[in-house]
Each structure stands twice: as structure tokens, then as C-alpha cells.
Amino acid sequence: MYLRRAVSKTLALPRRAPPGPAPLGKDASLRRMSSRKFPGTSGSNMIYYLVVGVTVSAGGYYTYKALTSKQVRRTEHVAEPKEQTKAELQPLPGEKEEHVAEAEQVCSEPGDTAVTEAESVDAEEVPEAAVVLPEESQASAPSEVPAEAAVVEASLSSSEPELKITEASLVETTESVPESTQEVESAAPDQDDVCNEGADTSQEGADTSQEGADTSQEGADTTKEEADNSKEAEGTTTEDPRSISEESAELEESPPLGSEPPAQPESQEEETQVTEETASPQG
């Protein structure tokens, strides 16, 4: 009971006391004394904080807008000259078609003449090779393979220049499309030179095809000579057994001069003597 009363008294005293700051001593420092209260009232401090915050936020927003607007202006100034240069470089679609048609006409005229000449030369050479091939087949079958290979090589060599001419014309047309009219006019002599070079290459291909035909003819001649030699050899082999058999028959019919006559009577006399001797002991 005594302890209970003492505890209740000690706990009840702080509850009844007002919640005020602790009293400062005589030896308290200035920092502690100044930190106890803020300068001015609480309402004036809130207004100060609001004004400072609004000014800082407004300044930041203004600087952000100024920087973004400058960047947009710079990009617009840079994009405008780029679009102008692109519009100047890209010609109209009608002009492109005209340039392509002119380039094709310039390159097609000499190219077509060269191709027709090469085709005519090949058409003249192919019948000659066709005439030579049946004779070779009658002479010897293995000789057909090199002649056919030579004809195929000649046709391939004649077709290669045509492919080169078409590739050169295609490259020239693709290169001349994006150019302007002045550049096309300046490039016309160069295209003529290229077309002349294509005609020269086609002539060289025709020459190579002629050389291939000549080589095939030489091969046919050699095969003919071999066939003739083989026929002569077969003729000699077929004639030899017949001549040998005829000579042997003649030798059997007529013996050579100075040879001894056949010994048939002597053999008959010996047989008679043997029969007499065998008969005498029996008698």
C-alpha cells in the first residue's frame, strides 16, 4: 500500500505539469538559445517558402523551353537545305525515261549490228561442221567426240561476246539514269566508245569461232587419214591368209625340181619279203 501511493504520486505530477520547454541554465550557449525559435512568425515563413519555390520553378521552366526551341530551329534550318539539294539532284520521272530511252538507242544500234554479224558467221560455220561430222561417223566412231567438242566450244566462244555486249549496255543504262541532261550529252561519246569496244569484242569472238572451225576441220582430216590407214592395214591382213593357202596348194600339186621321187615301190617290195618269210616257217 505504501509503495502504491508513492508510485501514483510520482506519476501524477508530470501529467498535471504544462508541457513547456525545459528551463535554460545560466551557462547555456548562444546556438542553443537561437535554435529554440525561428525568426518571425510561422505564417511569414510559409509565404517566404512559397515565393522562393514559385520563382525557382518558373525559371527552370523558362530555361527548358528556350533550349528546346533553339534545338528545333537548328534542325529546321539544317533540314531545309538538305531537302532543297535532294529536290535539285532528283530529276523528274519524265526526264528519267527520256534519258533511258536515248541511252538504249545509242547502245542498241552498234550492238545489234555486231550481234547480227556474229550470228551470220556462226550460221555459216555450223553447216560446214554438220557436213564434216557424217563423214567422220562413217570413218570412225571415236573421232566424233573431239569434233563435237570443238563445235560446242566455237558456239560458246561466239555467245560470250553477245553476253558481254548486253551486260555493258545494261550497266551504262543504269548509270545514266540519275544523271541530268547535260551529263548525258557529255557521256554520249564515251558510250559510243564502249559500243565500239563491244563490236570489237564480237569480231574477236567471230575470229575465235573461225579458228575453232579450222581446228575441227584439221581434226576431221587427221581422222580420215587414220581411217584410210586402218582400211589399208585390214586389206593386207585379209589378203595374206588367202595368198598363203594358194601357195601351199601349188606346192603340194607340183613338187620342186631336183626333189627325189616318192618311195612307194620300195615299201611294196619290203612287204612282199616279210610275207614270204612268215610263210616259209609255217610250211
Swiss-Prot record:
Q: Which UniProt keywords apply?
A: Membrane, Mitochondrion, Mitochondrion inner membrane, Mitochondrion outer membrane, Transmembrane, Transmembrane helix
According to its record, how does it sit in the membrane?
Answer: Single-pass type IV membrane protein
Spans of biased composition, class Low complexity?
A: 128-160
Subcellular localization is given as: Mitochondrion; Mitochondrion outer membrane; Mitochondrion inner membrane
What is the name attached to this protein's record? Protein MGARP
Residue ranges under compositional bias (Basic and acidic residues)?
221-245
Positions on the Mitochondrial intermembrane side per record topology: 65-283
Function summary? Plays a role in the trafficking of mitochondria along microtubules. Regulates the kinesin-mediated axonal transport of mitochondria to nerve terminals along microtubules during hypoxia. Participates in the translocation of TRAK2/GRIF1 from the cytoplasm to the mitochondrion. Also plays a role in steroidogenesis through maintenance of mitochondrial abundance and morphology. Plays an inhibitory role during neocortex development by regulating mitochondrial morphology, distribution and motility in neocortical neurons.
Q: How does it assemble?
A: Interacts with RHOT1/Miro-1, RHOT2/Miro-2, TRAK1/OIP106 and TRAK2/GRIF1.
**What GO terms in the biological process aspect are recorded for it?**
anterograde axonal transport; axon development; axonal transport of mitochondrion; cellular response to gonadotropin-releasing hormone; cellular response to hypoxia; cellular response to steroid hormone stimulus; cerebral cortex development; negative regulation of dendrite development
GO CC terms, sorted: axon cytoplasm; mitochondrial inner membrane; mitochondrial outer membrane; mitochondrion
